[in-house]
Amino acid sequence: MAKNRRDRNSWGGFSEKTYEWSSEEEEPVKKAGPVQVLVVKDDHSFELDETALNRILLSEAVRDKEVVAVSVAGAFRKGKSFLMDFMLRYMYNQESVDWVGDHNEPLTGFSWRGGSERETTGIQIWSEIFLINKPDGKKVAVLLMDTQGTFDSQSTLRDSATVFALSTMISSIQVYNLSQNVQEDDLQHLQLFTEYGRLAMEETFLKPFQSLIFLVRDWSFPYEFSYGSDGGSKFLEKRLKVSGNQHEELQNVRKHIHSCFTKISCFLLPHPGLKVATNPNFDGKLKEIDDEFIKNLKILIPWLLSPESLDIKEINGNKITCRGLVEYFKAYIKIYQGEELPHPKSMLQATAEANNLAAVATAKDTYNKKMEEICGGDKPFLAPNDLQTKHLELKEESVKLFRGVKKMGGEEFSRRYLQQLETEIDELYIQYIKHNDSKNIFHAARTPATLFVVIFITYVIAGVTGFIGLDIIASLCNMIMGLTLITLCTWAYIRYSGEYRELGAVIDQVAAALWDQGSTNEALYKLYSAAATHRHLYHQAFPAPKSESTEQSEKKKM
C-alpha cells in the first residue's frame, strides 16, 4: 500500500514522500530513521532482524531495483555516523547547489555524539531507500549503512571482525574511516577483516569485494599531499606500493588488499576544527565547523554519492537487487552465527600460540632424536622395561626443555601446550614400542607360529574325531585347518610382496588376539599334552603301513 504525505524532513524542510509497505494491513506513516538490522548480543552472538530488513528492502518500490550499498566502517569514535548524516543531507537535497544546509541547522539522522564512549552498535541502515537515476538512465536503489566501530572496550576481536567483514561483503562501496594517517596496523586490520569476510564467501576467480575508499580524517600534512581525492590518490599509491626492499610481511599485506578489491581510492579530509573537538554540546551546526572542512566536505560527498560514482552491488559478476541483497544478508549471517569459521585472534594471542607451538615442536624433536639413538631403525631389539625407562627419562627431559623456553602468554596459557606435548610424546612412544617389537624375532614370528599351532591342533582334533565317528566335527576342523593354511600362505605372500597390507594387518591382529589367550609356554604345553594323551587314538585313526613279514606272522597266528 502506498500513501503520499508532506513530511518535515530531518533538516527542517518539507518534502513529498511516498511510503511503501509489503504488508496488507495499513500501518501508520513513520518518519525515516536508522534501523538496527544486525544486533550484537551481550554474549557476543549475532542476530539479524529479518523483519526490519524485509520491511525496508522488500517494499514494492525498491525490491526489484539493482542496489548500491554504501557503508562506513572503521575504529570507534572517529566520526563515522557524523559523516553518514552529511551523506543523508546530500541524498535528500542533491539537486540543490547548497545541499549542505543552513549554517544554524543541527545535524540529525544517524545517532551520533561527541565523547569517548561508543554510540553505534551492530549494523544500522537508513529506513528510506533512495531511488537515483544513473547517467545511463537506469534507476538504482541506494542503501546507506552505518556500522559499529572496531576495537571499543566492550567488543571482542571477533565482534569487530564480523561486523567489518559483513559490511564489506554486503556493500558495493566501503568507506574505511581512519584518523590522521594510514598506519601499518590499519592495513593489517584491514587484511584480517577482509580475509575473515573472504572465508565466508564462495571461492571465485574474481576479486571478492568492490570499491574501497580510504577516508583519512584530520589530515595534517596538506603541504605533502593536498586535501581531496588527488592528494589522496598520490598518498595511497605511496602507502600501498610494493617494493623489493620491503619485508615480506609488509609486501603480503599490500598484495592481499589489492587482491580483494576491484577499485581502491583515497580522500584526505582536514580537521573540522577545535570547536567540534572540544565542545561537549556540539550538535553539528555548520557555523561551528571550520570552513576548510566544509569546503572539502562539499567535494567529498558528491565524489562518493553522485549518480556517476555509484557502483551497483555485484557478487560473482552478477548485479544484485534489493531482494537478492536480503538473501545474501541472511546467508552470510548464518555463517557467522555458526562455528564453521575460525575465530580471529589478537596479535598477542597469535604470537603466543606460535611461540608455544614452536617450543612444543623443539621439545618433541629432542625426544624424537634421542629415542632414535636408543631404538632407531639400525638399533637392535631393546627389552620393553628398558625402553619404558628411557622413555620416561627423555619425556621428563623434554618437559624441562619446554618449560625452560621463554614463552609469551604466561604459565596458564602454556599449560595446555604442555599437555599437548605430553600427549604427542606418549603417541610417539607407542610407535617406538611397535617398532622395537618388530625387531624381536619371536614377535616377528608370532603370526606364522600362531597359525601353525592352529593348523596342528585342528589336524589332531580332525584325526581324533574322525576316528571316533564325529564326522561333522572332523569336517569342521578340516575346513578350519584349510582356511588357516590359506591364511598362512596369504600372509607369507603379503610379507614377501608388500601388497594388500591392510589384509596383512587384519591377519596380524587376529593372530595377536589368539596369541594373547595364553603365553607361548602354556599353548605349547597344552599342545603337547593333547598330543600325548591321544597318541594311541591317533595311530589307530591313521595306522602306519605294515611290512610283509609282519603280515605273514599275523596270518600264521590265525
From Swiss-Prot:
Start and end residues of each GB1/RHD3-type G domain: 64-309
Positions annotated to bind Mg(2+): S81
Binding site for GDP: R77, K78, G79, K80, S81, F82, Q148, R217, D218, V276, N279
The protein's role, per its UniProt record: Atlastin-1 (ATL1) is a membrane-anchored GTPase that mediates the GTP-dependent fusion of endoplasmic reticulum (ER) membranes, maintaining the continuous ER network. It facilitates the formation of three-way junctions where ER tubules intersect. Two atlastin-1 on neighboring ER tubules bind GTP and form loose homodimers through the GB1/RHD3-type G domains and 3HB regions. Upon GTP hydrolysis, the 3HB regions tighten, pulling the membranes together to drive their fusion. After fusion, the homodimer disassembles upon release of inorganic phosphate (Pi).
Annotated localization: Endoplasmic reticulum membrane; Golgi apparatus membrane; Cell projection, Axon
Lumenal domain ranges by topology: 471
Membrane topology of the entry: Multi-pass membrane protein
Notes concerning its domains: The N-terminal hypervariable region (HVR) regulates ATL1-mediated membrane tethering by organizing ATL1 into a lattice structure on the same membrane. It does not affect GTP hydrolysis or membrane fusion. It has no effect on the GTP hydrolysis and fusion steps. The GB1/RHD3-type G domain mediates GTP-binding and hydrolysis as well as homodimerization.
Positions carrying Phosphoserine: S10, S22, S23
Catalyzed reactions: GTP + H2O = GDP + phosphate + H(+)
Record's protein name: Atlastin-1
InterPro entries found in the cross-reference section: G_GB1_RHD3_dom, Guanylate-bd_C_sf, Guanylate-bd_N, P-loop_NTPase
Designated gene of the protein: ATL1
Cytoplasmic face of the membrane: 1-449, 493-558
Residues annotated with N6-acetyllysine modification: K395
The organism's taxonomic lineage, starting at the top: Eukaryota, Metazoa, Chordata, Craniata, Vertebrata
Binding site for GTP: R77, K78, G79, K80, S81, F82, R217, D218, V276
Annotated EC: 3.6.5.-
Stretches for region 3HB (three-helix bundle) domain: 347-438
GO BP: any one term: protein homooligomerization
Keywords assigned: Acetylation, Cell projection, Coiled coil, Endoplasmic reticulum, Golgi apparatus, GTP-binding, Hydrolase, Magnesium, Membrane, Metal-binding, Nucleotide-binding, Phosphoprotein, Transmembrane, Transmembrane helix
Entry similarity comment: Belongs to the TRAFAC class dynamin-like GTPase superfamily. GB1/RHD3 GTPase family. GB1 subfamily.
Annotated region described as Autoinhibitory domain, given as residue ranges: 521-558
Coiled-coil spans in chain: 418-439
Gene Ontology cellular component annotations, sorted alphabetically: axon; endoplasmic reticulum; endoplasmic reticulum membrane; endoplasmic reticulum tubular network; endoplasmic reticulum tubular network membrane; Golgi apparatus; Golgi cis cisterna membrane; Golgi membrane
Gene3D superfamilies the record matches: AHSP, P-loop containing nucleotide triphosphate hydrolases
Annotated stretches, region: N-terminal hypervariable region (HVR): 1-34
